[in-house]
Curated annotation (Swiss-Prot):
Its EC number is 3.1.-.-, 5.6.2.4. Keywords: ATP-binding, DNA damage, DNA repair, DNA-binding, Exonuclease, Helicase, Hydrolase, Isomerase, Nuclease, Nucleotide-binding. CDD domains: DEXQc_UvrD (cd17932). Residues 514-808 form the UvrD-like helicase C-terminal domain. The heterodimer acts as both an ATP-dependent DNA helicase and an ATP-dependent, dual-direction single-stranded exonuclease. Recognizes the chi site generating a DNA molecule suitable for the initiation of homologous recombination. The AddA nuclease domain is required for chi fragment generation; this subunit has the helicase and 3' -> 5' nuclease activities. This is ATP-dependent helicase/nuclease subunit A.
Length: 1242
């Protein structure tokens, strides 16, 4: 069957290749869509063309469209809906189009998981599955795994004669727990689920270990990867020797070295030849390997630089060959085979444990009526296929044939991120073979960055290699290489790098002409859009810093450099092209994104940017569990679950919930020094109080224990969500945190905890203990309950995000930071490794000697995984570079720039475009790749120094490369610190610091200088009456009374834990004012009734117990028996705690001298009481100053003192009332509760 392509309409906006992707049919089609090539638009247009065609149109529900995310599915439905509306506007009478709009909501446009769920709900009767099943929460699944693992291992430990199991435990667990074995079982189980037949895959793990002494080691699957690695290393060694030989033969070169170098070259060539022969011969040849000594080169005829360089190249070659001898080929083949035979029972035991776990776990999920996302795929696969009884091969089931008949075409977006199980499902619902099929796949394997989620990019690559442009041999492939996103400079720069970096062995594909990005946009000329590379030179030895500290400093330095550049971009300004208006506009903060490999150092970056006045934000999902309010509530829940936990209990008591101070906690601990803190608390409540402080603490302890008992009872009887909300109500904690800074976010955090409790109880688990364990699992996994605030597109901030998060997005200006950060290779050194092809491999542990060493399969998987990791990192770098529309900045921070450049220079003279495999494979960071590529460019600038091939050096890309000294970024503050370090150290050590005599007079003059307008410094725009009173005292009025005593030595207060807790006079005064404000003036105001009202105020938490004890009910009762008190009770109008604000001239308040006569000050205050009776308005201010003892009962003296101290305040009060209320104040009084007398204020 020939491929069919409808002719492109005249005037179409689509390129020829895009139209081919839209219109081609009749077979399976793979569209390799480069970044920015409009693949989503092409996919949508293909669907629109199919459903709106005037002839042969299909219904939208006869298409299966599979997307990578739910958001992508929703966007695609929206785009299709808009296109249908536009088409309907042109053809308003089309019943077919109206039908498509009605079918669209139910169309099969979804993620593959959603499609699987629909299949399962339709055919659930073919499975042993309750139709009311639900999809389990991820953490619920983790908890269930734990339970099943515990049950499995308990059974294994209980079996008699289970020697194999105990051998596994001894080999792969620590002395104290079997956590490592549990992790191994779960890792193998989850990895197996990415295979269409997980049980068969597990059962076949031992096949690689089916060897005997006659096995040819070269025939083993593992040997292929070992040989590939050896060939790469030997080729690299031969190339290094060749370059050393070229140096030896140069004028001034170490010519005596030439003969020895030729011998080395021949020896390495011989080893390369032996790679294709028996393994034993190669092992013997490497064992007998010997690099001879180089002859001496002395005299003026020889260039020392060339001598050193030649030696260095030979040493590098020796290291590579000797590493092969000492590692991969260190053992005789018979020894490798013996280890594999000894490993077989170990691997078989582990595989059987995983298979048993899989059965038990599946049964546990079925019992609870739950499935996970992996189950969706495998249940769907089970429904869609059946095994042919004769051939044993899988065939489409009747259900699959129904779907094949239902769907005219199956369209898959982001095909490069498909896994093996998903591929099997797609192959079952599509029709025909590749040559006659209806599978349409769109993706870009260069953007496949989800291998850690077990995506398999080789599925895409395999089809890309097999399919042809005309589709005659099978499937058809279409390359969409035109990029409509980026400026030419960005594309040229990206192409320049990847033409040198991405290859078949290292990179998994060749970055050839078809893969290169073609300029398709229409940007106007103008801005300098050349990519910029900035390398910060820290100029220090690597060992000076610990890795974490060095990384932290690198992030700070890079953030400072980015801040400097961002300021230039925004203020210079840099212009970006606005497609909506078709005009350039000034760049804004929202046009800029900072991309990083991980968010570890994002907080430091944000801090540095904001310190420079640059608004910055990042989607930081961490920190929820560290929030104070959440920490307190989780501690309270832990105490309710089990009060015998000292740390949570102490945290709760010390928190704002119960406000125990350190003295009270010490009293509690002393009540029972050896028991738990809870036991001490119970003992403390029961012991006789010896002091007032102890009695008060005991009341608090009793109240807490009573509440705790009630909450524990509630936890047993009611739901967890009800308990949490009741805690919020009982403690008023929800309202309390709302009044703190960031109160809305704090309350949102508490609501998130409540919501999570409700979600938890909708799962198969119940109870407070399990919930707390659930939370612990979340914390261990790094999950977070608090959703980060999503940023709106129009928020004018610089965004910081990971490269993975940026996939599918585009930004005018991109900063790619942290390029020198090493690749994460820790997983390659795990005691066991997994691979889809090679299976399971682990270190061999000698049962008697307890020594472990790598096995051949482990070395093979390590080699394979390292190349896969490098390919993934290369694709991640590609994604990052292709996010930029107009400007790209690449940043890195290194310890020694000169040393790094020297390391890269060897790449400059390499022939051809693609750098050798070993050069690319030896990279430890993105910077290693970029540096080795840029050093070959004419714009290498700071990096250049060696002649590169002309075809590479003259590439049309333009670069700006700069080495930035870190000192330029550390700032003036750091420079001062460095300069003054000796002086600061001398001061810290108490040594004399030398002074320069020339400055002494100036220092003295400055110290003795007095400000001419000192009084003006006390003038504020807003001032309280009490502050005004104190300032008047300070500047003269009542000066003798208030001036501090001179010449006394400072007296330091005792530490708080040694102080006796008493209220200050001000605190006592506040307590009395609270009582006077809340008393019911119509009640019988005698002493006993006032005392009962004080108790009520304590219960309402308007007063503390200490404050209540400081209030004298008899003094208050005396006031109400006096004439002024009786008038207050009988008044027709009473106002208590009257606030006011009054604008006055500064000169009037402070005196004319030293103040601006026209300046005004806002005076604020609160008047204790104003009432109105037949005499008019009467004003009272209550005073609690201790005057009786001070003036020995002389009330006249006391009255004069109070008038002098508060007269100004009262006159301001009177003036405020009269101006604001526009009514005269007839009488004005001070009432002193100490002595019970009234002072009239004129």
């Amino acid at each position: 069957m020939n491929a069919t392509i409808r002719p492109k309409p005249a005037g179409s906006r689509w390129t020829d290749e895009q139209w081919k992707a839209i219109a081609a049919g009749g077979r399976d089609i793979l569209v390799a869509a480069a970044a920015g090539s409009g693949k989503t638009a092409v996919l949508v247009e293909r669907i629109i063309q199919k459903v709106t065609a005037e002839e042969g149109a299909v219904d939208i529900d006869r298409l299966l469209v599979v997307t990578f995310t739910n958001a992508a599915a929703a966007e695609m439905k929206a785009r299709i809906g808009e296109a249908l509306e536009r088409e309907l506007a042109k053809r308003p009478h089309s019943l077919h189009l109206r039908r498509q709009l009605s079918l669209l909501p139910r169309a099969a446009i979804s993620t593959l998981h959603s499609f699987c769920l629909d299949v399962i709900r339709k055919y659930y009767y073919l499975l042993d599955l309750d139709p009311s099943f639900r999809i389990a929460d991820e953490t619920e699944i983790e908890l269930l795994k734990e339970d099943v693992l515990e049950e499995l291992l308990e059974e294994e430990y209980g079996k008699p004669d289970n020697e194999r199991f105990f051998a596994v435990v001894d080999a792969y667990t620590g002395d104290r727990s079997d956590a490592e074995l549990q992790e191994m079982i779960v890792a193998l189980y989850e990895f197996s689920r990415s295979h269409p037949e997980p049980d068969e895959w597990l059962a076949g793990l031992t096949s690689m270990y089916d060897v005997d002494e006659r096995t040819d080691i070269k025939t083993l699957p593992a040997a292929r990867y070992i040989a590939q690695h050896a060939a790469m290393e030997l080729a690299a060694a031969r190339r290094l020797i060749r370059r050393a030989l070229e140096l030896a033969e140069e004028p001034g070169g170490p010519r005596p070295y030439a003969e020895r170098l030729r011998e080395d070259r021949d020896m390495i060539t011989d080893l390369e030849t032996r790679l294709s022969g028996p393994w034993a011969e190669l092992h013997r040849a490497l064992k007998a390997l010997s690099f001879g000594r180089l002859p001496a080169c002395r005299g003026k005829d020889y260039d020392e630089r060339l001598i050193d360089e030649a030696k260095s190249l030979r040493d590098q070659a020796k290291k590579k060959v000797e590493a092969l001898r000492d590692n991969v080929f260190s053992l005789d083949p018979s020894v490798w085979l013996r280890h594999m035979r000894e490993m077989k029972p170990i691997v078989e035991t582990i595989a059987n444990l995983v298979r048993r776990f899989a059965v038990m776990f599946q049964a546990a999920k079925r019992e609870k009526g739950i499935v996970d996302f992996s189950d969706l795929e495998h249940y769907c696969l089970h429904i869609l296929r059946r095994r042919d009884p004769e051939t044993g091969e899988w065939q489409p089931s009747p259900a699959a044939l129904e779907y094949q008949a239902q769907f005219d075409e199956v369209l898959v977006d982001e095909y490069q991120d498909t896994n093996l199980v998903q591929e099997a499902i797609l192959q079952l619902v599509k029709k025909g073979s590749e040559r006659t099929g209806n599978l349409f796949m769109v993706g870009d394997v260069k953007q496949s960055i989800y291998r850690f989620r077990l995506a398999e990019p080789m599925l895409f690559l395999d089809k890309y290699k097999r399919f042809t442009a005309d589709g005659e041999e099978g499937g058809m492939k279409i390359d969409l290489a035109s990029n409509f996103r980026s400026r030419r400079e960005v594309l040229d720069g990206t192409n320049f790098l990847f033409a040198q970096l991405m290859g078949e062995t290292v990179g998994e594909m060749v970055y050839d002409e078809a893969a290169q990005l073609k300029y398709g946009a229409d940007y106007p000329e103008g801005e300098d859009a050349a990519p910029e590379v900035m390398i910060i030179n820290r100029q220090r030895a690597a060992e000076e810093d610990e890795e974490e500290a060095a990384e932290w400093e690198a992030a700070e330095l890079e953030a400072r450099l980015m801040a400097k550049k961002i300021k230039e971009i925004v203020s210079a300004p840099f212009y970006v092209y606005d497609r909506s208006s078709g005009q350039p506009r000034r760049a804004m903060y929202r046009d800029i994104v900072i991309l990083v490999r991980s968010m570890t150092n994002a907080p430091q970056m944000i801090e540095q940017l904001q310190a420079q006045g640059i608004p910055a934000a990042a989607d930081l999902s961490s920190g929820y569990f560290q929030a104070t309010e959440i920490s307190i509530m989780l501690s309270l829940l832990k105490v309710i679950d089990n009060p015998h936990q000292d740390i949570p209990l102490a945290a709760v008591l010390r928190s704002p919930l119960f406000r125990f101070d350190e003295n009270e906690l010490a009293m509690i601990r002393l009540a029972d020094p050896k028991g738990t803190f809870y036991e001490a608390l119970c003992s403390f409540r029961q012991k006789p109080a010896e002091t007032k402080e102890e009695a008060n603490a005991q009341r608090k302890a009793a109240a807490f224990l009573e509440r705790l008992e009630g909450w524990r009872t509630m936890a047993r009887r009611r739901s967890l969500a009800d308990l949490i909300w009741q805690l919020y109500r009982d403690t008023q904690f929800y309202d309390f945190v709302g009044a703190l800074p960031g109160g809305r976010q704090r309350q949102a955090n508490l609501r998130a905890l409540y919501d999570r409790a409700r979600q938890y109880e909708s799962t198969s688990f119940r109870g407070l203990f399990r919930f707390l364990r659930f939370i612990e699992r979340l914390q261990e996994r790094g999950d977070d309950l608090g959703a980060a605030r999503p940023l709106g597109e129009q928020e004018d901030v610089v965004r910081i995000m990971t490269i993975h998060s940026s996939k599918g997005l585009e930004f005018p200006i991109v900063f790619l930071a942290g390029l020198a950060r090493p690749f994460h290779t820790r997983d390659l050194h795990h005691p066991y490794l997994l691979d889809k092809e090679l299976g399971f491999a682990a270190r061999f542990v000698h049962p008697r000697l307890r020594i472990s060493y790598p096995t051949l399969p482990l070395l093979a998987i390590q080699t394979k995984k390292r190349l896969e990791l490098l390919a993934e990192e290369m694709r991640i770098l590609y994604v990052a570079l292709t996010r930029a529309k107009e400007k790209l900045y690449l940043l890195a921070s290194v310890n020694d720039a000169a040393k790094e450049i020297e390391k890269w220079k060897s790449a400059a003279s390499e022939r051809g475009w693609l750098l050798p495999d070993d050069v690319r494979a030896s990279a430890r960071s993105y910077l290693d790749w970029i540096g080795r590529a840029l050093i070959r460019h004419r714009d290498g600038g700071a990096l250049a120094g060696t002649k590169a091939p002309e075809e590479v050096a003259s590439h049309p890309s333009v670069w700006r490369v700069a080495i930035v000294p870190a000192a330029d970024l550390r700032g003036a503050e750091a420079a001062r610190e460095e300069m003054d370090g000796g002086v600061l150290l001398a001061l810290e050590q108490g040594r004399p610091v030398p002074v320069e005599g020339g400055w002494q007079k100036e220092v003295k003059r400055r110290l003795l200088w007095r400000y001419s307008y000192e009084k003006e410094t006390a003038v504020r725009a807003k001032q309280s009456v009490s502050e005004l009173k104190e300032q008047r005292a300070l500047f003269g009025e009542q000066a003798d009374e208030w001036r501090p005593r001179q010449g006394t030595a400072p007296v330091f207060s005792r530490p708080r834990f040694m102080q006796e807790k008493t209220l200050t006079p001000a605190e006592k005064g506040t307590a009395l004012h609270v009582v006077m404000r809340h008393l019911d003036l119509q009640a019988p105001l005698d002493e006993s009734w006032i005392r009962s009202q004080i108790v009520r105020l304590v219960e309402k938490e308007l007063l503390s117990a200490e404050q209540a004890e400081a209030v004298d009910p008899a003094a208050i009762a005396a006031f109400f028996t006096a004439d002024l008190g009786r008038r207050l009770c009988a008044a027709r109008e009473v106002h208590r705690e009257v606030p006011f604000s009054l604008g006055l001239k500064a000169a009037e308040l402070y005196g004319g001298e030293g103040t601006e006569s026209g300046r005004r000050v806002l005076v604020q205050g609160v008047i204790d009481c104003v009432f109105a009776d037949e005499c008019g308005y009467v004003m009272i201010d209550y005073k609690t100053d201790e005057v009786v003892h001070r003036f020995a009962g002389q009330k006249e003296e006391a009255a004069r003192f109070l008038l002098g101290r508060y007269g100004t305040q009262m006159r301001l009060y009177r003036r405020a009332i009269e101006q604001i209320w526009r009514a005269p104040v007839a009488e004005c009084y001070l009432y002193s509760f100490d002595g019970g007398f009234v002072v009239a204020v004129e």
